[in-house]
Amino acid sequence: MRLAILSHCTIDEISQNGQVVETPGGPAAYCGITAKNMKFDVDLHTRVGPDFKFRHDLENKGLSFSQNSSSSNPTTRFLLKILGVERELYLKAKCDQIEFNNSDADGFIVSPVFDEISEETLDKIREDSNFFMFDPQGFLRRVDDTGKIYLEKTLLDISKITAIKTDPDEAFYLTGLREKDAMIALQKKGVKHVLYTNKQNITMLVKDRLYDLHIPDMTIGDTTGVGDIFCAAFTCSYLKEKDSLWAICFAVGAAQAALETKATGLSKIPNSGIIQQNAAYLYNSVKFSQV
């Protein structure tokens, strides 16, 4: 099966415990490698500049860059200051928008990091795709005079979307509501699966049922990319099995496996065997409730 991913590859400067590590990042990388680990072909729609020195590393992991991915402008670059379980995000450079024509992929992940996807592209994918996973973070982000990223309320058409992943802040800036009320509001806007991630507590709303899962307590290190791993695992599992409950267990199992590595950057991406073990355990511990 083939998965199309629309997002920037980034250069992430990760600052933690007094050290700064430079690593490739972005949903294009995290989702792409996760999908490859799950035996999917990946159709990568991204842009990188001449300063992106990690192309060979990603190609060795199975990702392919088209000629259209090359830009003369710098690669999108972030500084991530990790402060316990919280983080501050700063934009240091922004690459070109992604130009999208078409793809015969079985499913799409659209996960912009900052202004690389137009609403016109969003509309095209919404109309053309059978499965559409959407992470809206890049549409909600703004930048202040210091480069620090913050979120702002944004009117966005999210109809005809198969699944959306939001955290509490993103859900609030999309709906003006919190928790279950925000999830119901997103569903009413036309989303089939609402995936609400609040640190180690994850809730999925499908039809009139809520599914609650919990990642075991642990010391949390670098969380960069965990949400992307989650999105890719849900998407690949759902495309293979067409089972919403198993897909959310697989997604949470992938996030748990990534966190358990305690690794920085792409090294935290788990293999499918470990994800499968976690998912099987989670499947028997899901809590259900009616909306």
Map each language-model feature to its residues.
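Short, conserved phosphate/pyrophosphate- and ester-handling motifs at nucleotide-, phospho-/glycolipid
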Residues: 35, 167, 227
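Short glycine-enriched, charge-decorated loop/helix-capping segments at active-site entrances
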Residues: 17-23, 147-149, 180, 218
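Active-site metal-binding loops of divalent metal-dependent hydrolases
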Residues: 7-9, 229
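Short catalytic helix/loop segments, enriched in acidic residues and glycine
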Residues: 20-33
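Conserved phosphate/ATP/ADP-binding segment of small-molecule kinases
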Residues: 141-212
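Alpha-helix C-terminal capping segments
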Residues: 32-41, 237-240
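Conserved post-catalytic alpha-helical subdomain immediately downstream of the catalytic base
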Residues: 193, 216-286
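Conserved N-terminal subdomain of the carbohydrate kinase-like
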Residues: 2, 11-22, 37-133, 276-291
